[in-house]
Amino acid sequence: MITVIYPGTFDPITNGHLDIIQRTARLFPNVLVAVASNPNKKPLFDLATRVELVKQAVAHLPNVTVVGFLDLLADVVKERNITAIIRGVRSASDFDYELQLAHLNRLLTNGVESLFFPPSERWSYVSSTMIREIHLHHGDVSQLVPEVVFHALQNLKK
């Protein structure tokens, strides 16, 4: 059975991420969205909250499953017999970085390939970093994130 994985920190999940998940779900029978703990970053939301926000954002997609993970992505890929790794690439600088990761992941997973998805034009400028920055300065991100994330961000202000 073909299963692809879309890993990320998703802090928070954006409409750009959701767009890639929806497009991936149309192409593959099973999509695993893997939310990384990433201890090197100071997240806005803890891992459990990010997993829950992603689950709610993709609840309308029956072939998408969401998990959190603490290990190396390569370990998750091997444990779950993943067919391919999905990565979003917004720019040439993203591609350079993602290409290095793809080579490393191919080595660590005994050949699992990475597939690069460009964003839809509508979301090409959206990133979790931008969302956090706009939120920090009390800007309106309601058009850039799923509704559940917008409400979670509003609750952080209280």
Swiss-Prot record:
Cellular location of this protein? Answer: Cytoplasm
Keywords of the record, alphabetical order, are:
ATP-binding, Coenzyme A biosynthesis, Cytoplasm, Magnesium, Nucleotide-binding, Nucleotidyltransferase, Transferase
* CDD domains, alphabetized: PPAT
Indicate the annotated site residue(s) for Transition state stabilizer: 17
Biological process (GO) annotations? coenzyme A biosynthetic process
Q: In which pathway does it act?
A: Cofactor biosynthesis; coenzyme A biosynthesis; CoA from (R)-pantothenate: step 4/5
Protein name as catalogued: Phosphopantetheine adenylyltransferase
User: Native species of this protein?
Assistant: Pasteurella multocida (strain Pm70)
